[in-house]
Regions:
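ATP-dependent carboxylate activation and anion-phosphoryl transfer catalytic cores
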Residues: 2-194
Length: 194
């Protein structure tokens, strides 16, 4: 091949032979001393979605997702809330024979998988603030990209859909609600266990 930098193959079955071919080609024709080869999964027709995660070091929860696929020059132009309740409501209005049903059902199951993964990840690292768990999504598959352990400017999209109620376990009518992620960060920082 004349282009040693990028080779995209559509099928996985001939992969071992293709890897040997690329390694031999790099060994013979590669420039310089660096003969490293990187193999990446080529994912097409994707969306960029992030899950809002909140934890205090002991517990970790998620607050839905945001689809931030519409971007230009690596800047997000539009963020759309992707929440379980909305997807369930849309599915309830459709019959399973409706052509949109399958796509919504896939989106709901993928969101639930991402939220469960994000919550496990946050709990595993002892997350003690707010973060976003970012993924590339293609149909019913999602691929973890990164965890941003800071507030993001688009956090207001989540705040429009969620608020948290903190209740005294000994007195159900003793509670307060938080609808600001920044306020929640301050509360967690002030009251987390040492």
């Amino acid at each position: 091949s004349s282009d040693l930098s990028v080779q995209i193959e559509a099928a996985l079955s001939p992969l071992p032979g293709l890897v040997r071919e690329v390694l031999a080609e790099v060994k013979c024709l590669g420039v310089g001393d660096n003969k490293n080869v990187v193999a990446e999964l080529n994912v097409e027709e994707t969306s960029h979605q992030e899950i809002q995660v909140v934890g205090n070091g002991e517990w970790c929860i998620t607050m839905g997702g945001r689809d931030c696929s519409l971007q230009m020059h690596e800047q997000k132009l539009l963020e759309v809330s992707v929440i379980d309740e909305e997807l369930v409501e849309q599915l309830d209005r459709l019959s399973p024979e409706d052509p949109r049903y399958s796509g919504l059902d896939t989106a709901l199951n993928t969101l639930r998988k991402m939220e469960a993964e994000a919550s496990r990840f946050g709990a595993a690292v002892g997350l003690d603030s707010v973060s976003t768990f970012e993924c590339i999504v293609s149909d019913d598959e999602h691929y973890f990209m990164e965890m941003n352990t800071r507030i993001q400017v688009e956090h207001r999209v989540t705040e429009l859909c969620y608020k948290l109620r903190f209740t005294n376990p000994e007195q159900a009518d003793d509670y307060f609600e938080v609808d600001s992620l920044v306020e929640l960060m301050v509360l967690i920082a002030r009251h987390k266990k040492a």
